[in-house]
Amino acid sequence: RQYGTEQNPKKLQDLIGIRVVLYYYDDLSICRDIMESTFQMLDHWSRTNATANEFKATKINGVFRFPSEYFKVYKKDMWTLPIDTTFEIQFRTVFFEGWHEIEHDMRYKSLLSDNEFWRGSEELSRILNCILANLELSDWSLVQLFEQLSYNHYKNANWELMLKSKFRIHMDDNSELDPAILELFDRDKEIAKQFFKCKRKDLIRELLKLDAPQPSYNLIVKLLND
């Protein structure tokens, strides 16, 4: 595609493109909020649109302005080219990252048309779509599984395991909750319930305010309490 021509005066917006692969489906909205609060966004997020009967890889793409302090990294001559002062970022889950590579090689980037490639084996094409549907279900189910697990630990007063499964933050295996906090939660489950009801995105937002945080059970409780 030719940019900066009379027929297409648009500028290239993704000279720099970043792909971020996430563990969990609900991380998509968290990362979206982080980007919107950190950089100036152009237009809106481009996201997967599928009907109730369709299955497509879940991803979101956004275009943002370069902070002005980064302009000096590039030669001035470069900005005379049809290149916009923007970058593009894409978020997708780890399940769909693997799928994306297979799908592009075997479908979208193939020189053969999709109909020609699958001719005589339409049932296999449907099975491939079923695999995609299972990936979408896996993304959703994984989050729901840990939500239920955290609730079970809450009901059984397993406070450390409740925090680990609720917030899904990587921590040192030797991390332990302060005995005074354990005693407080054991004595008053309503207090423990307030921490159980906290949102994961709020914790991540607070962690991002720290320089090189080392997550632990005690730090989680402190940040959520503050």
Question: PLM features: what roles do these ranges have?
Answer:
Residues 1-22:
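Active-site acidic/histidine clusters and adjacent loop/turn architecture
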Residues 2-5, 62-69, 161-175:
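Short, charged low-complexity intrinsically disordered segments located at boundaries
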Residues 15-143:
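Long beta-strand-rich cores associated with HINT superfamily self-processing modules
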Residues 83-225:
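An acidic, glycine-/histidine-flanked metal-binding catalytic module
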